[in-house]
Amino acid sequence: MQENQELTKKEKYNIDKLQKRLRRNVGEAIADFNMIEEGDRIMVCLSGGKDSYTMLEILRNLQKSAPISFSLVAVNLDQKQPGFPEHILPAYLEQLGVEYKIVEENTYGIVKEKIPEGKTTCSLCSRLRRGILYRTATELGATKIALGHHRDDILQTLFLNMFYGGKMKGMPPKLMSDDGKHIVIRPLAYCREKDIERFSQAKGFPIIPCNLCGSQPNLQRQVIADMLRDWDKRYPGRIETMFSAMQNVVPSHLSDVNLFDFKGITHGSEVVDGGDLAFDREDIPLQPAGWQPEEEDARLDELRLNVVEVK
């Protein structure tokens, strides 16, 4: 009995620690990109997946202690997909006491009518969904639209564009919408997917399956996701370093003439970002930039014998 109680205490401690890390990540992203301002009305797009549930939970948590006042309204788009459990989200949100709106639009029927059987429906579905959410944001008087994309999504998008699109373009933590009328924010931009997965499981969110439409998954994105997961296992810190690289772009050492005036370089020009090292190799730090080991790993390191010093 005591062992079970201890296990429960340990689990609670781990959940609290995980929530603090997610809170810190979200808080830093909000501060770095000025995502939320005094008086903002944030439309939280809730799909019923782990990411959007976590985003809503952390934003609600931050709302209680934030130095500014802002409101949240959760919005779900019921696309009339077969088997969609309509009761789950209203019941969950009413239990929380969160203001919400369920938007009912038969985009599933439109997509099935327009797209031939066997072809991917994601592109058209995404455009329809985006338009409906923009309209809803206007109707609700929302000043920001919050989406649940996390750090792994952002990196996947970068590699997708590099491998298949021939451009270095990721997923912005904050940007104006393509219709020029709304500010879109991604509060989970600094959060790791594995942290979100663990938090979602611990909280027992009522997850709604994402494949109800029957569409095939994006195979290119899946390949990239698998590659990044493999790197994360084999080379701890690589994911953090790559994300850090997205925040430390050096245009003078790339090849985009629109970002840097290469043609304007003449004798007497100033040295930019260390200049050209010619045949010298750039110093690379031994420890991956932007990476810190898990607390558990750090504690294990403290317990290990330093075999070099043992006489």
Curated annotation (Swiss-Prot):
Class in the EC hierarchy, top level: transferase
Cofactor: how bound: Binds 1 [4Fe-4S] cluster per subunit. The cluster is chelated by three Cys residues, the fourth Fe has a free coordination site that may bind a sulfur atom transferred from the persulfide of IscS.
Cofactor names: Mg(2+); [4Fe-4S] cluster
GO MF, one annotated term: ATP binding
Positions of short motif PP-loop motif: 47-52
Keyword Heme carried by entry: no
Catalytic activity: cytidine(32) in tRNA + S-sulfanyl-L-cysteinyl-[cysteine desulfurase] + AH2 + ATP = 2-thiocytidine(32) in tRNA + L-cysteinyl-[cysteine desulfurase] + A + AMP + diphosphate + H(+)
Further comment: The thiolation reaction likely consists of two steps: a first activation step by ATP to form an adenylated intermediate of the target base of tRNA, and a second nucleophilic substitution step of the sulfur (S) atom supplied by the hydrosulfide attached to the Fe-S cluster.
UniProt subunit comment: Homodimer.
Function: Catalyzes the ATP-dependent 2-thiolation of cytidine in position 32 of tRNA, to form 2-thiocytidine (s(2)C32). The sulfur atoms are provided by the cysteine/cysteine desulfurase (IscS) system.
Protein name, per record: tRNA-cytidine(32) 2-sulfurtransferase
Species this protein is from: Klebsiella pneumoniae subsp. pneumoniae (strain ATCC 700721 / MGH 78578)
Source organism phylogeny: Bacteria, Pseudomonadati, Pseudomonadota, Gammaproteobacteria, Enterobacterales
Gene name of this polypeptide: ttcA
